[in-house]
């Protein structure tokens, strides 16, 4: 069994909550993860930027945290393409871990049926 420590970066509507896409209030723009073995040793890393399709301008807070420009993302792969590569990288048997439970809600349309979700917030 391996552990996938997940870190997501996302953007949101730059014009405020009133104008956000209610079906997609947060858009993932980066998936990062490390894979740990049963001894909790790092055995691999994953990091891919994602081309945004909903919010094509950064929210001011996102911009201040990530130090990216939209030019950095314009030629990247779409979320479904990156997610497919990420799940393939995860392998067959793993447990997702994260420092922040919100990552799982952001990914919720794309859960893995072969894995358990574990968050420090449930302990």
PLM feature spans:
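Conserved non-catalytic scaffold segment of RNase H-like nuclease domains
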Residues: 2-104
């Amino acid at each position: 069994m391996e552990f996938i420590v997940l870190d997501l970066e996302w953007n949101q509507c730059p014009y405020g909550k009133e104008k956000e896409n209610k079906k997609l209030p947060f858009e993932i723009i980066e998936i990062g993860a490390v894979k740990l073995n049963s001894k909790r040793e790092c055995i691999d890393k994953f990091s891919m930027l994602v081309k945004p399709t909903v919010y094509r301008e950064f929210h001011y807070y996102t911009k201040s945290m990530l130090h990216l420009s939209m030019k950095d993302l314009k030629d990247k792969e779409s979320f479904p393409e990156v997610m497919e590569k990420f799940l393939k990288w995860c392998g067959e048997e793993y447990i997702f871990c994260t420092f922040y439970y919100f990552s799982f809600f952001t990914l919720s349309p794309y859960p893995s049926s072969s894995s358990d979700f574990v968050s420090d917030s449930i302990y």
